[in-house]
Amino acid sequence: IQTRYANLDTIEEDYGINLLPLATFAMDKYAGDPCEQFKPKGDEVLSDKDFNMIAKMHKAISIMQWKMEGQIIKRRPEFRMENRLLLDKIDFEKGTVLVDGVEYPMNDMNFPTIDPKDPYKLTEEEQEVMDKVKSSFVNSEKLQQHVEFLYAKGSVYHIENGNLLYHGVVPMTAKGSFAVERFEGRRYSGRALMDYCDARARRGYYAPEGSAERQNGQDFLWYLWCGRLSPLFGRSAMTTFERLYVEDASTHTEVKDPYYTWYNEEAVCRSILAEFGLPGTSHIVNGHVPVQEKKGESPIKGGGRLVVIDGGFCRAYHEKTGIAGYTLVYSSRTMSLRTHQPFESAEKAVRENLDILSQKNILETENHRILVEDTDEGEVLRERVHDLKQLVTAYQLGWIPEARCEDHVW
């Protein structure tokens, strides 16, 4: 993804990860390949040399990615993602690939590292590159701090002050019921599916190093990124391979989960809230999909029960959406949505004294001011006060003996 948008500074400079092994490998293996389909996108100003090098890096790491994804799919048949095994569907003589049983011509047939007899096996050189890159990731202190923070503070969903927050979807069927997925011999749907996904993802970080459980969790983290019923993905497939190699646009389609149709219905939003033990007056705060406001799309769904928040971090979407994202503000009186207008950069805004314009839209006004005691934090404070009172009572009744200085060894 970072090579696609020429955003390698984040990896190399911010996280201190060495990409030289990948660059050296790519420049060697794809020396005479223009890598047309892999040229970086975006408005980053690059020299021709850097532009071509990043394109080659993009192709090299993509091939390795598809090989390793294929290994996961074969290792985890429960994911039911065999339709994403495409490297073994390439006909190297005819220059075609089978996608969902249909043969399509390919626009690029330069695969110097793929063995048609064993297409998902990394070459020795590829394995060496992956080992070095992995070592850099594992030994990046800042990256590990950020990953630790995500596991400590993050979750697949979160309930805060009566609001249900999640990134992607609660997988649904075309009839509007919660979709059922089977993992490790059990069926899950709705909240139970979200809880399962959260727990299994944690195995990939907290299970003992080198254990089967840790590998199991790490494989599942990949499923969460692009799996057919992943609550974090919400689409039928990630068709990156087809977009790069097949000109026929029909293969590029990524069918959205029925959730994206049903979340417009207030009754469905209320059923989702009920699934998570919340009243119908609560709100769902949803992310993941940019809202195309310039085409008239509204971020407010389901009769006001659901709000779609796109933070606008991906500049590439600004032209498509017509905005630079939203900020949801929840105060003691109101819940409001701030719509930000596109701007080039914060640095330019400060340098040229430009206004960063935002439009305020009040979604809901409370009849009475919400106090700290009315919030989840207030409940935590109440419990602490109760515990302290219990402690004082226990001390006053002599259940906790007074400690004297001579009892301690200093």
Stretches found by the model and what they are:
Residues 1-410:
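Feature recognizes metal-dependent phosphohydrolase scaffolds
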